[in-house]
């Protein structure tokens, strides 16, 4: 991960550190190395905004998961279920996790969202009023996320919408 810290690198150190910590996403990857470097440049000062360095690696790892699922001919949800961290998982920073609700959360979200098994090309009729069908999983180490409570809360407040966003704070947030 390379970060353009601008002329002063105000918050580059913290942003780059967080990018490295979140670089592998919520996936159990046996052989992974994440390198993150911040650079001084002649660009305007830049640094932490909203997710403090988490957005860039999250976008990269989730895009990679989509590319892999397409090349392997596997449903994107299925690939994430196979590789998602489970109870007792060890992160690439060697942190041992206790209870991990990733697969349960992903399964429940895909059920509520009406995600059907199979690639989008064979999934059946596609709604014309909504462009695309995506799912993303927020990965915030150290933050307690109770999937059961979140899904109970979201079920009645599920939203459909259109938009382009760079994080899960966007249009479908409960």
Task: Enumerate the language-model features and the residues they cover.
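Gly/Pro-rich active-site capping loops and adjacent beta-alpha segments
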Residues: 1-57, 138-147, 152-174
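Helix-loop-helix junctions that connect adjacent transmembrane helices in secondary transporters/permeases
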Residues: 85-174
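Alpha-helical support elements that line or immediately flank enzyme active sites
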Residues: 10-22, 50-78, 83, 104, ...
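Short acidic (Asp/Glu) and glycine-rich catalytic loops that position anionic groups and cofactors
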Residues: 40-45, 81-90
């Amino acid at each position: 991960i390379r970060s353009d810290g601008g002329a002063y690198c105000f918050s580059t150190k913290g942003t780059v550190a967080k990018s490295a910590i979140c670089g592998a996403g919520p996936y159990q990857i046996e052989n992974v190395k994440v390198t993150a470097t911040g650079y001084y440049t002649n660009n305007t000062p830049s640094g932490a905004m909203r997710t403090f360095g988490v957005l860039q690696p999250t976008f990269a790892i989730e895009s990679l998961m989509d590319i892999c699922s397409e090349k392997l001919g596997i449903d994107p949800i299925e690939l994430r279920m196979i590789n998602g961290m489970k109870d007792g998982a060890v992160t690439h920073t060697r942190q041992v996790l206790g209870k991990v609700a990733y697969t349960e959360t992903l399964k429940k979200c895909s059920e509520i969202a009406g995600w059907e098994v199979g690639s989008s090309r064979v999934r059946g009729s596609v709604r014309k009023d909504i462009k695309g069908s995506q799912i993303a999983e927020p990965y915030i180490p150290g933050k307690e996320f109770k999937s059961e409570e979140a899904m109970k809360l979201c079920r009645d407040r599920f939203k459909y919408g259109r938009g382009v966003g760079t994080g899960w704070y966007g249009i479908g947030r409960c």
